[in-house]
Amino acid sequence: MRADPASAAADIFEANRARGAVRFDVRLQDGMTRRHHLHESGSLRVRFPSPEDDGLSAMFVNTAGGIAGGDRFAVEVAAGEGSRVTLSSAAAEKVYRAPGKPAELDIALTAAAGAHIAWLPQETILFDRARIHRRIDIDLAATASLLLCEIVVFGRTAMGERMREGEFVDRWRLRRGGRLVFAETVRLDGDIGGKLAHPAIANGAAAIGTALIVPGDAALVERIRESLPAFRGEAGLSAWNGFAMARFCAQDAASLRADMMAVLGCASAVPLPRLWLN
């Protein structure tokens, strides 16, 4: 019996896709946040730099060198009562052209009473015709806190490249005290370059970003608003239901990163990961 060529090609494609997962939890012990259980698999790894305070820092490393179509990665982090953890990445994540299936990235963050999670990865860079589906699920206790930021760059702007076509689906869900308090799905596909050029979407920007701050209120928004005149790009701020959100767009990654850092400085006493400062 001869193998079906299409089926054989699909099997080869699947066998060559990258897989990676990191799962761990942290607990407060003797006044310090310490790593507890840890699981790593595939090409995703995590490193724990020397702590600068009583919190814990974790840095994710993708040894595959980037994300391609059909790759699947997962991150799960749970913070125990009173613990504090800052999560970042060793480098900007590159998502390459995907002729077939989209890449998939699942992120699950859980914080118990009094815990704090800061999710501060470096930017995600989408190459032309990249395809990725990302899902971020957050479950906070009523007294837990969160600082979450994401930057997406459409093309290698430092090299003068722009993303013309592709697919980007970004699904966020936030639960607080067992209730769903925020749900959003962003979907850009097809002629992404043309859509980003639309004044009602990104007005020609090549980089977008979002910062979600829990708890957050109007006073925090006013503190951030005072720094707006120095921004290199554009930003919008709002606060409702006990949390605050800032949205950004800029012509390049460096400008958006600078604006994001200004907001993070207003929003949290947690120091930025050292790699953000390089």
From Swiss-Prot:
GO cellular component term of the entry, any: cytoplasm
Recorded superkingdom: Bacteria
Keyword set, alphabetical order: Chaperone, Cytoplasm, Nickel insertion
Coiled-coil segments on the chain, per record: none
Subcellular location: Cytoplasm
GO MF annotations, alphabetized: nickel cation binding
Quaternary structure and partners: UreD, UreF and UreG form a complex that acts as a GTP-hydrolysis-dependent molecular chaperone, activating the urease apoprotein by helping to assemble the nickel containing metallocenter of UreC. The UreE protein probably delivers the nickel.
Family: Belongs to the UreD family.
Purpose: Required for maturation of urease via the functional incorporation of the urease nickel metallocenter.
Protein name, entry field: Urease accessory protein UreD 3
Organism: Bradyrhizobium sp. (strain BTAi1 / ATCC BAA-1182)
Lineage: Bacteria, Pseudomonadati, Pseudomonadota, Alphaproteobacteria, Hyphomicrobiales
Gene: ureD3
